[in-house]
């Protein structure tokens, strides 16, 4: 069995406003820790992955290579179901995924129509950010049947949140991913997902998930989260994020509408 170890939730300095570690440095830390690859999952942006592509092209021109696998993903901010991790087939380009604010049912439809997979990040975490703590889906979790996986372990979530996330994955018979959700260097590599077989690109990953090739996930809790540092004050930050997300969704309304028209017209 060819087992590969990935960190499946990674934020970079280039792609996430709150990311502190450039992607080349991020990948280097994971490689030194014995990881085979990572999923770039910046907030509503592929800028981090594009920075990696640029680095990779420079290596090729210099006649060098790197066997560490960097997969293109995104953490999408829905308007009604919190954060959703999305992976599209290799070479796929959907501008709509960089425009926050779609309702989750429409996001699921778009991703599946284009051959991708998706699942809720930290599903039992913070209010508004996590699907089981949203007003619309708190008591209506049948939508879980439509996902392809669940993030079962997130290093930035507490033990109870991760326990419930794994129970959710088990109840709906979904494979569970593990990811550090790292924004800072000291959080990188605190979670993992083990895959059965060679995963060299996004299409490999999608095929692996669909054939039941997710073996295990787990990790350790990161003690330096904003929630840990701020305590009760963190609730104010969560409320401000809700406002920011809705404002961002309104700001991108016309761009989303234009991209949706293009998507369904084609």
Model-derived features with residue positions:
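Divalent metal-dependent hydrolysis catalytic cores, especially in the metallo-beta-lactamase
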Residues: 7, 27-47, 117-119
């Amino acid at each position: 069995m060819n087992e590969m170890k990935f960190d499946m939730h990674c934020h970079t300095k280039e792609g996430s406003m709150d990311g502190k570690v450039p992607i080349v440095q991020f990948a280097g830390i994971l490689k030194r820790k014995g990881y085979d690859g990572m999923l770039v999952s910046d907030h509503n942006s592929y800028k981090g992955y594009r920075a990696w592509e640029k680095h990779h092209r420079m290596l090729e021109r210099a006649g060098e290579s790197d066997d560490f696998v960097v997969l293109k993903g995104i953490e999408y901010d829905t308007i009604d179901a919190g954060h959703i991790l999305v992976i599209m087939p290799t070479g796929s380009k959907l501008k709509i995924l960089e425009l926050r604010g779609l309702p989750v049912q429409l996001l699921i439809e778009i991703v599946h129509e284009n051959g991708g997979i998706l699942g809720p990040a930290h599903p039992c975490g913070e209010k508004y950010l996590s699907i089981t703590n949203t007003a619309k889906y708190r008591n209506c979790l049948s939508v879980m049947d439509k996902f392809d996986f669940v993030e079962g372990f997130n290093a930035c979530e507490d033990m109870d949140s991760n326990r419930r996330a794994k129970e959710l994955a088990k109840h709906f018979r979904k494979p569970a991913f593990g990811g550090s959700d790292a924004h800072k260097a000291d959080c990188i590599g605190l979670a993992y997902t083990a895959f059965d077989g060679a995963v060299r690109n996004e299409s490999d990953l999608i095929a692996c998930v669909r054939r039941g090739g997710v073996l295990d996930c787990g990790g350790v809790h990161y003690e330096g989260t904003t929630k840990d540092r701020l305590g009760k004050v963190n609730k104010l930050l969560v409320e401000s994020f809700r406002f920011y997300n809705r404002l961002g969704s309104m700001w991108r309304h016309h761009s989303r509408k234009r991209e949706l028209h293009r998507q369904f017209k084609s």
